[in-house]
């Protein structure tokens, strides 16, 4: 007969079973301790975003009593709609629902934007931690989470760091298609981001990564080892988990080496895939770093009227054309918020 003491400890406690379930690798979807934080924050951000995108009233984004409509119920469509950033009247103040005198005031001042952005930021950081956690439990290396840190850094730059540097959440990127375009145009006007070296590295990372991905995929697809007849798809010959190579890396290496030159092609599959991961990740890191420095007005290069002839007359360059375009965009945005051509805020 089992004693009461042994019977008490024979069945694990509810907390112990919960901990085992959270950390279990046998779940269809891994939860993890970062997932315990990720799930409620991302669900909150997604729910509030959907509701606000559909039905939020106009927001006084500039703090001058001129509300901007962003939701579908107030005349927008999928392209023009957005969750409008928190009002400039709020600035960087923490603005939860209980800080407003009423729900209408909270909505008028753009409270949903701050709620979404803060929960979203915690959620994506938790997702990155969850990637590391699952990799650790499976005995894998941690580079999946490191790669994901690039989009996390980019989102943090436009939603958190830039508003902090500019002094108001109203300067954050709107949560919508046209709002994103407006953010990009105003960012160019105020910071000349196209002339910033870190943005150039980001462009090289994104477009270069796309090029390298397309090149790698097409080379592999073109050098598959056929395991089927001519009447069957070549893809049928692959069995998940097979030990044999699925493509001829020697043939792919030889083709690319002859197409360009010998040392342009990788002869090591591991170094090749490391390069494919590193190139876009480092580029996006630099872009995020550039946006974060421009948040504090360390802007792109300004070569305004830098080329002159022997008589001192200006010879216009494309840099001068860009500067003229920047001035045009600058004077047209927030045109009722200030009385000077340049934004003196």
Curated annotation (Swiss-Prot):
It is a multi-pass membrane protein. This is Photosystem II protein D1. Tyr-162 forms a radical intermediate that is referred to as redox-active TyrZ, YZ or Y-Z. Its EC number is 1.10.3.9. HAMAP family: PSII_PsbA_D1. The lineage of its organism: Eukaryota, Discoba, Euglenozoa, Euglenida, Spirocuta. Gene3D superfamilies: Photosystem II protein D1-like. Changing residue 265 to A: Herbicide resistance. Chlorophyll a ChlzD1 binds at residue 119. Signal peptide: none annotated. GO terms for biological process: photosynthetic electron transport in photosystem II; response to herbicide. It is found in: Plastid, Chloroplast thylakoid membrane. Belongs to the reaction center PufL/M/PsbA/D family. GO terms for molecular function: chlorophyll binding; electron transporter, transferring electrons within the cyclic electron transport pathway of photosynthesis activity; iron ion binding; oxidoreductase activity, acting on diphenols and related substances as donors, oxygen as acceptor; oxygen evolving activity. The chain crosses the membrane at residues 30-47, 119-134, 143-157, 198-219, 275-289. It comes from the Eukaryota. A quinone binds at residues 216, 265-266. PSII is composed of 1 copy each of membrane proteins PsbA, PsbB, PsbC, PsbD, PsbE, PsbF, PsbH, PsbI, PsbJ, PsbK, PsbL, PsbM, PsbT, PsbY, PsbZ, Psb30/Ycf12, at least 3 peripheral proteins of the oxygen-evolving complex and a large number of cofactors. It forms dimeric complexes. Keywords: Calcium, Chlorophyll, Chloroplast, Chromophore, Electron transport, Herbicide resistance, Iron, Magnesium, Manganese, Membrane, Metal-binding, Oxidoreductase, Photosynthesis, Photosystem II, Plastid, Thylakoid, Transmembrane, Transmembrane helix, Transport. Pheophytin a binds at residue 127. The gene is psbA. Fe cation binds at residues 216, 273. The D1/D2 heterodimer binds P680, chlorophylls that are the primary electron donor of PSII, and subsequent electron acceptors. It shares a non-heme iron and each subunit binds pheophytin, quinone, additional chlorophylls, carotenoids and lipids. D1 provides most of the ligands for the Mn4-Ca-O5 cluster of the oxygen-evolving complex (OEC). There is also a Cl(-1) ion associated with D1 and D2, which is required for oxygen evolution. The PSII complex binds additional chlorophylls, carotenoids and specific lipids. It comes from Euglena gracilis. Photosystem II (PSII) is a light-driven water:plastoquinone oxidoreductase that uses light energy to abstract electrons from H(2)O, generating O(2) and a proton gradient subsequently used for ATP formation. It consists of a core antenna complex that captures photons, and an electron transfer chain that converts photonic excitation into a charge separation. The D1/D2 (PsbA/PsbD) reaction center heterodimer binds P680, the primary electron donor of PSII as well as several subsequent electron acceptors. The record marks 191 as: Stabilizes free radical intermediate. [CaMn4O5] cluster binds at residues 171, 190, 333-334, 343, 345.
């Amino acid at each position: 007969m089992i004693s009461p003491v042994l019977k008490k400890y024979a069945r694990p406690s509810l907390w112990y079973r919960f901990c085992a379930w959270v950390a279990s690798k046998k779940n269809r979807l891994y939860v993890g301790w970062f997932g315990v934080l990720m799930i409620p924050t991302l669900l909150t951000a997604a729910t509030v975003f959907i509701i606000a995108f559909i039905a939020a009233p106009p927001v006084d984004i500039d703090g001058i009593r001129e509300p901007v409509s962003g939701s579908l119920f107030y005349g927008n469509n999928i392209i023009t709609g957005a969750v409008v950033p928190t009002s400039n009247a709020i600035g960087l103040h923490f603005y939860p629902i209980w800080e407003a005198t009423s729900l209408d005031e909270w909505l008028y001042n753009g409270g949903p934007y701050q709620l979404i952005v803060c929960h979203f930021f915690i959620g994506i950081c938790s997702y990155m931690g969850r990637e590391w956690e699952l990799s650790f439990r499976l005995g894998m290396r941690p580079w999946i989470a490191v790669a994901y840190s690039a989009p996390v850094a980019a989102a943090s730059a436009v939603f958190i760091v830039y508003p902090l540097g500019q002094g108001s959440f109203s300067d954050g990127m709107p949560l919508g298609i046209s709002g994103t375009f407006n953010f990009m145009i105003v960012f160019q006007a105020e910071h000349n981001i196209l002339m910033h070296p870190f943005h150039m590295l980001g462009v090289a990372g994104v477009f270069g990564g796309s090029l390298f991905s397309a090149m790698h995929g097409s080379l592999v697809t073109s050098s598959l080892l056929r395991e089927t007849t001519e009447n069957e798809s070549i893809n049928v010959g692959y069995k998940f988990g097979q030990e044999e190579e699925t493509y001829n890396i020697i043939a792919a290496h030889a083709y690319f080496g002859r197409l360009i030159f010998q040392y342009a092609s990788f002869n090591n599959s591991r170094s090749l895939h490391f390069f494919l991961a590193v190139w876009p990740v480092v580029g996006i890191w630099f872009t995020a770093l550039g946006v974060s420095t421009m948040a504090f007005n360390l802007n792109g290069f300004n070569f305004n009227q830098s080329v002159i002839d022997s008589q001192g007359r200006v010879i216009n360059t494309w840099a001068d054309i860009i500067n003229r375009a920047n001035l045009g965009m600058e004077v047209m945005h927030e045109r009722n918020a200030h009385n000077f051509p340049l934004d003196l805020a």
